[in-house]
């Protein structure tokens, strides 16, 4: 039986990593072997753990290239969990397809759009393959409504790949994004 791909996406501060960690916990409670991964570029909260903004975390294999995932997969691995997929190369698509064909469920969390509202290529590729998509929202940093679907960069230049947290990014709704972008 083929594995299933679940994508958890949305803006920053929407609970993507928290949701990913809840799926890890479900698999562990079911005594299923898991493999958890994060990109080396993301060391915001911990160098070897996936950690949510709320502080919950789990140990992870830290990798630079998607192909490295294969060396950590064992015969009895049932679930693969990958955080911050937007930071990986598009080669992740082929790795995930291979895992699914081997009957392994894959859960990926990551941003769908850059702060300029451009799609992250790797996330977009994975979305095209997904069996289930969980699109998260956040509370808008400006108006306070639970309708934020975008991430706005408020410090640190215009680079689209720029790892950071609350010192650089806020979650905003589309109306507030447009209002705030006019000021920048």
Swiss-Prot record:
Keyword Transferase: yes
Enzyme class at the top of the EC tree: transferase
Entry EC no(s): 2.7.1.21
Any one Gene Ontology molecular-function term assigned to this protein's record: zinc ion binding
Pfam families in alphabetical order: TK
Broad class of where this protein is predominantly found: cytoplasm
Identification of the protein by name: Thymidine kinase
Organism: Thermotoga petrophila (strain ATCC BAA-488 / DSM 13995 / JCM 10881 / RKU-1)
Lineage, uppermost ranks: Bacteria, Thermotogati, Thermotogota, Thermotogae, Thermotogales
């Amino acid at each position: 039986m083929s594995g299933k791909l679940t994508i958890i996406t949305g803006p920053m501060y929407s609970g993507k990593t928290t949701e990913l960690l809840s799926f890890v916990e479900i698999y562990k409670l079911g005594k299923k072997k898991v493999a958890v991964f994060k990109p080396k570029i993301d060391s915001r909260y911990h160098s070897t753990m996936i950690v949510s903004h709320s502080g919950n975390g789990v140990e992870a294999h830290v990798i630079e290239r998607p192909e490295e995932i294969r060396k950590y997969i064992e015969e009895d691995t049932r679930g693969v969990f990958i955080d911050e997929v937007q930071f990986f190369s598009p080669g992740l698509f082929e790795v995930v397809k291979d895992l699914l064909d081997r009957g392994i469920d894959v859960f990926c969390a990551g941003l769908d759009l850059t702060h300029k509202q451009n799609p992250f290529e790797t996330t977009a590729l994975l979305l095209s393959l997904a069996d289930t998509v969980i699109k998260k929202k956040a509370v808008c940093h400006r108006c306070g409504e639970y309708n934020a679907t975008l991430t706005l960069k408020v410090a640190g230049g215009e680079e689209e790949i720029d790892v950071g947290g609350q010192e650089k990014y806020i979650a905003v709704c589309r109306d507030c994004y447009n209002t705030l972008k006019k000021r920048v």
